[in-house]
Amino acid sequence: MGLLSQKDIKPFVQQAFVHGKMEGNVFHASEVCLRMLEDSKNQDDPKLGRYLFIGDSISGNYDKALRTALMGKLNIYHPPTNCGPVRKGVENIVQWLGAYDQPGLDWDVISFNFGQWDSANTKARYQDDLEKVIAELKKTKAKLIFVTTTPIPGGYPPPGELGPENKATGRVQKTMERFINPWALEVMSRHPEIEICDQHALISNEKFYATWLKKAGFHKKGENNPNGDLHIGGLLGEPVGRQLARKVLDVLGREDEPLSPHGLVSNDLDPRRQRSATKDIDVDDFSDLLESDQRLRKYRR
C-alpha cells in the first residue's frame, strides 16, 4: 500500500485507525483509515490562550457556567465524549490532547477529574492510572488543575466498607470524601505543581447545596427523586463552574482579572421557579457566591 510520510497528514487534524498484524517486532499495516477532525485553529481567537477541561457528565453540568465565566478570555475545549473513569483517560488521553506540539494547538491550561465512574475502583488501580494520565498531561507543559470529585448526596445508600484489594464502596454516601478524593490527593501530593480546585469542599459547605446534599439520590436504579441525583444540573452547576473558572485565571497569573458576568436574570433566580433541590434558595447569598472571588477561592488546598 506504500508509506504515508508525516507531510501526508499535516496539519494534524485527522484521526488514524490502523489495521494490520505483528510480524516479530514489526507491525505491518494493511489499511489506514483517516477520519477528519475539527480544525480548532479555524474557530480559535488567536489572541486568546487555549484551555482543555477533562471530566465526566458532572463537567457537562457546569459546562455553561464555566464557559460563561471565561467568555472572551480563553478558547475553551472539552473532549467530545463523557471522559468517564480514569481507565478511559489512560486509553484516550493522547487523542484528547491532540497535536499540542503543532503551532496553534498547544494548551495553556488543562483541568481534569476522574472519580464518579471510579467509585468502585481499587486504590492501587485508580492511583496507577492517574499517574499514567498525569505523565501525558505534563508533556504538554500546560498549567494543570485537578478537580476534586463532587459528593454523592444523602439519598443514596449509606456508607460501606472497603472491599477486597482496597476496592471503594461504589455510589453510596461518602465514597468520595472517604476514598476517591483522598486517593487522588495522595497522588497530587507527589506533583506539587498541580493546582487543586476543590469542588467537593464548596458543595459540602455552601448552604445553597444543603437540600440537594441531604435529599438527592436513590437507593434503587429507576427510582424517581424530585431532588435529582448526583448530577448538579441547572443552578447547581453555577457555583462550581465559576469556582473552576476563577482557579483557571489564577493559575495563569490573572488573579486581578474579573470573571465575565454570570448572565443569570431574575426569573432564573425566582424561588417559585426552582426545582425541589433549589427551592429554598437565598437569592442574595447565592448571587454573592457567584460574584465573590473571595468565596470562590475559599476552598483552597
Task: Cite the ranges covered by each PLM segment.
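Conserved SGNH/GDSL esterase-like catalytic core that processes O-acyl groups on lipids
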Residues: 19-132, 153, 231, 267-300
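Helix-enriched interaction subdomains in cytosolic or periplasmic regions
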Residues: 2-24
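Surface-exposed amphipathic alpha-helices with a cationic face
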Residues: 134-138
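Catalytic His-Asp segment of secreted/periplasmic serine-dependent ester chemistry enzymes
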Residues: 2, 10-11, 151-301
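A short helix->loop->beta-strand "cap" motif at the edges of active sites that frequently abuts
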Residues: 139-144
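A cross-family glycoside hydrolase active-site/sugar-binding cleft signature
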Residues: 113, 147-149, 200
